[in-house]
């Protein structure tokens, strides 16, 4: 999904409706942070709301764009945690290596701050079995999502979980990096 829906809350604050469940008409804009920054800067964003409303101008907090990124990251971390609780995540070098070699790994998560030699070994293995690898979370974030300590490698072993997680990661990447991520 390349767009983000925005609605006005009861306090007249603009809210990013990432779950697409909030009531109200709302507006949709491309979900690129750069595009949103520009539309906030030049006033386009507010004008889109004001043209449909006769009351007060909507309020946008100073941390609005950061909150969207944080919500998108929370969605990714939450899905990793849910997958773990569903038994669809293996972690630890040997378990992940084994899941790659057996073809069970649908998505490889590697901590961005893991040791270079371990990351490269996993990368080579993932490429050999054509398993997608994601390397943008630091170990602390990956560990937190999995309720463990020092997690460097994790294997998503359910294709449904891998697809859901990939979609959330893609949405976050698109928001942060814009169309270059696509």
Sequence positions of predicted segments:
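Short basic, glycine-rich beta-strand/loop surfaces that mediate nucleic-acid
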Residues: 128-171
């Amino acid at each position: 999904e390349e767009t983000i829906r925005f609605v006005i809350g009861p306090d007249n604050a603009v809210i990013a409706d990432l779950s697409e469940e909030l009531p109200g008409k709302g507006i949709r804009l491309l979900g690129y942070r750069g595009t949103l920054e520009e539309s906030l800067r030049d006033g386009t964003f507010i004008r889109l709301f004001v043209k449909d409303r006769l009351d007060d101008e909507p309020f946008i907090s100073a941390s609005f764009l950061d909150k969207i990124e944080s919500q998108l990251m929370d969605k990714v971390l939450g899905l990793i945690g849910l997958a773990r609780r569903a038994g669809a995540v293996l972690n630890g070098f040997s378990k992940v290596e084994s899941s790659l070699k057996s073809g069970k790994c649908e998505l490889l998560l590697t901590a961005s701050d893991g040791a270079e030699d371990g990351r490269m070994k996993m990368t080579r293995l993932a490429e050999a079995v054509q398993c997608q690898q994601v390397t943008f979370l630091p170990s602390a974030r990956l560990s937190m999502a999995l309720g463990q300590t020092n997690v460097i490698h994790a294997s998503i072993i359910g294709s449904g979980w891998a697809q859901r997680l990939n979609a959330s990661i893609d949405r976050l990447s698109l928001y942060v990096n814009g169309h270059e991520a696509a």
